[in-house]
């Protein structure tokens, strides 16, 4: 029997560090924040296209990817770039977001008849 542990998924902080290292090794430098915001919008649009075709009423064109994970990773990549550029610690930001949503929405969705099956 092996005592090997499965590799752990990287944390948000580790992903932020890996993206920063990649940018400075291969990308020379970050694009401007405004350019990266435009890139993020573009990547979200590409994800929307895949979702519309896979889960909506549209059909795929020849040669289009059917896998939303590629587009989701692209969205996350550019979002991490923006976080790095603007000094946002995504781990702390997510913790604050969970706290805010939990306080604000503690009973909101439980009492929503639209979400009952």
What spans do the regions from the language model cover?
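Flexible "arm" and connector segments at domain edges
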Residues: 1-72, 76-117
């Amino acid at each position: 029997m092996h005592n090997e542990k499965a590799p752990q998924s990287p944390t948000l902080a580790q992903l932020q560090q890996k993206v920063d290292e990649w940018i400075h090794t291969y990308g020379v430098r970050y694009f401007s924040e405004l350019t990266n915001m435009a890139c993020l919008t573009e990547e979200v649009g590409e994800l929307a296209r895949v979702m519309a075709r896979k889960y909506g009423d549209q059909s795929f064109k020849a040669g289009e990817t059917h896998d939303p994970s590629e587009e989701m990773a692209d969205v996350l990549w550019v979002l991490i770039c923006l976080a790095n550029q603007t000094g946002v610690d995504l781990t702390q930001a997510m913790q604050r977001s969970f706290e805010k949503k939990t306080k604000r929405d503690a009973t909101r969705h439980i009492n929503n008849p639209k979400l009952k099956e």
